[in-house]
């Protein structure tokens, strides 16, 4: 097979300082075989970063294998990751290699790692510690060599404290945490991404659509709580409904009140405040130009204890980071917003340091 000439990470679009910073970290991390934990909100591109780490590593010619662990029972996960022998259970009509075997020599991405059951956590930990496994229904021990990358949007520290996630597994997978920035923190990247998604739409549909400058200005003011995935959805829907080859503000789905289904709209409102429906920032307006009822920063009031970082741990991180919240967030594997929230809750001021 000819070697790919595509630059690693070419599918990651953006020029913002926040994006460049995590791209640099990912490139550095790729030089080792240490486990990586990709953290961040849903839709921030964790799978793309996992692939970037793989493609930039010495394992780039070996397989990159992924599995989304969400909603899979312990039995299904065991079969998917470790494989099974013929007749191991009802329906096992043939031998099957698991994802660990398929990824041997390469990289294994376990997405939604925070959703695996306590029952399976112990089995996964054993494989990670010993580098060997047995297929379900088998007796032969198989050696496996994979670079593990995990991804989650869950607060694993809270899960550990609540006894929902094993502390030993947490330390095993959280060797190098990388927190991906949400789209609202990536200054200037929304127009670039929207253009990319529109170009893709044009290729796939034989169209030649373009954005009016005013349309990109409106998109740039949106928070997009669903991040890149939501922006892609918005762009595709708007392009589909556009009245001409130039997409004007009136074509935007959010301008026509069609951004979310009623159920999703209610869920988003409960999570981030009514002012963030379709992500309009505080001080901006909704579709008819009326002031938003609640600013997006009301999200802090519903963060609750799940985002609170322990005082001693927070003070140590802030001291190490020289009071730079973004750096402290990377050290803690949290978001800068969670760091700021915890500083205020604990009443910590710079003079402490």
Swiss-Prot record:
The entry lists its GO molecular-function terms as: ATP binding; ATP hydrolysis activity; DNA-binding transcription factor activity; sequence-specific DNA binding
Q: Does the keyword DNA-binding apply?
A: yes
Q: Which InterPro entries match?
A: AAA+_ATPase (IPR003593), HTH_Fis (IPR002197), Nif-specific_regulatory_prot (IPR010113), P-loop_NTPase (IPR027417), Sigma_54_int (IPR002078), Sigma_54_int_dom_ATP-bd_1 (IPR025662), Sigma_54_int_dom_ATP-bd_2 (IPR025943), Sigma_54_int_dom_CS (IPR025944)
List ligand-binding residues for ATP.
40-47, 103-112
Q: Which CDD domains match?
A: AAA
The record ties this protein, via PROSITE patterns, to: SIGMA54_INTERACT_1, SIGMA54_INTERACT_2, SIGMA54_INTERACT_3, SIGMA54_INTERACT_4
> NCBIfam families under this entry?
nifA
Q: How does it assemble?
A: Interacts with sigma-54.
Q: Which protein, by its recorded name, is this?
A: Nif-specific regulatory protein
């Amino acid at each position: 097979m000819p070697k790919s000439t595509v630059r690693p990470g070419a599918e990651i679009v953006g020029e913002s300082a926040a994006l460049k910073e995590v791209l640099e970290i990912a490139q550095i991390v790729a030089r080792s075989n240490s486990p990586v934990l990709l953290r961040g909100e849903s839709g921030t591109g964790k799978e793309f970063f996992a692939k970037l780490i793989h493609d930039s590593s010495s394992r780039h010619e070996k397989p990159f294998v992924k599995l989304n662990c969400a909603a899979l029972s312990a039995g299904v996960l065991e079969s998917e990751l470790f494989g099974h022998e013929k007749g191991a259970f009802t329906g096992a009509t043939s031998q099957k290699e698991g994802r660990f075997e398929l990824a041997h020599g390469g990289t294994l991405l376990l997405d939604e790692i925070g959703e695996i059951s306590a029952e399976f956590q112990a089995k996964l930990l054993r494989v990670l510690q010993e580098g060997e496994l047995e297929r379900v229904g088998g007796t032969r021990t198989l050696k496996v060599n994979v670079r593990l990358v995990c991804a989650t949007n869950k607060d694993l520290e809270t899960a550990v404290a609540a006894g929902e996630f094993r502390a030993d597994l947490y330390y095993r997978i959280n060797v190098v945490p990388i927190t991906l920035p949400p789209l609202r923190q990536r200054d200037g990247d929304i127009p670039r991404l929207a253009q990319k998604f529109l170009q893709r739409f044009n290729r796939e549909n034989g169209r030649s659509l373009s954005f009016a400058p005013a349309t990109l200005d409106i998109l740039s003011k949106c928070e997009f709580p669903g991040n890149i995935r939501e922006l892609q959805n918005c762009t595709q829907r708007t392009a589909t409904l556009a009245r001409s080859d130039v997409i004007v503000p009136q074509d935007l789905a959010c301008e026509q009140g069609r951004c979310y289904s009623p159920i999703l709209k209610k869920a988003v409102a409960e999570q981030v405040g009514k002012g963030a429906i379709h992500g309009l920032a505080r001080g901006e307006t909704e579709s008819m130009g009326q002031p938003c009822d609640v600013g997006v920063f009301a999200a802090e009031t519903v963060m609750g204890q799940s985002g609170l970082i322990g005082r001693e741990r927070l003070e140590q991180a802030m001291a190490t980071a020289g009071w730079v919240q973004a750096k402290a967030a990377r050290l803690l594997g949290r978001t800068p917003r969670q760091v700021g929230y915890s500083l205020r809750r604990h009443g910590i001021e710079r003079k402490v340091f």
